[in-house]
């Protein structure tokens, strides 16, 4: 089923190291074409969903990429704070915004990025692409294991665990509407 997706096939071919199941069983980490595979997704809930699905794919079918430290998640900002006086600052989550509000006197303009596509080329380079200034999170096997487990539980056929998860975590949800 996974290999029916054209984008997944393209990714596998781009990596150059094969796929461990149903694609010739020819996974060979020594043929990897890139030192870093960077997942770039929006800083919102939808981006987190996409990242979780990709981590699940890597964990289940190409775990060596994670074990050998090749998978990273880019951390794009969620906000840009621009004070009347002083330097603008990128903020990566709501906690950072709350802290910024408490520690900065005076008025400031706040821009919220709904997605990477809302940034102009210069902003995207400065915040997410430039190796000198970007923030990358190395994916560890436990991150991928948890992503896979949550994906299986939320998308699987077993209703009781999903219902329980929703009830237990409903108050923690950050709605992006």
Residue ranges and their predicted role:
Residues 1-177:
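Conserved phosphate-chemistry cores used by DNA topoisomerases
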């Amino acid at each position: 089923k996974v290999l029916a997706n054209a984008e997944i096939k393209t990714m596998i071919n781009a990596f150059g190291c094969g796929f461990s199941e149903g694609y010739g069983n020819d996974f060979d980490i020594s043929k990897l074409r890139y030192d870093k595979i960077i997942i770039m997704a929006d800083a919102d809930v939808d981006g987190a969903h996409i990242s979780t699905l990709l981590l699940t794919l890597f964990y289940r079918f190409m775990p060596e990429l994670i074990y050998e430290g090749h998978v990273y998640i880019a951390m794009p900002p969620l906000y840009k704070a621009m004070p009347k006086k002083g330097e603008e600052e990128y903020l990566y989550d709501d906690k950072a915004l709350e802290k910024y509000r408490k520690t900065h006197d005076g008025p400031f303009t706040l821009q919220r990025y709904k997605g990477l596509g809302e940034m102009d080329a210069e902003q995207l380079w400065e915040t997410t692409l430039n190796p000198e200034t970007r923030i990358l999170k190395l994916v560890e096997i436990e991150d991928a294991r948890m992503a896979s487990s949550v994906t299986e539980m939320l998308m699987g056929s077993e209703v009781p665990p999903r219902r329980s998860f929703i009830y237990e975590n409903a108050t923690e949800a950050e709605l992006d509407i």
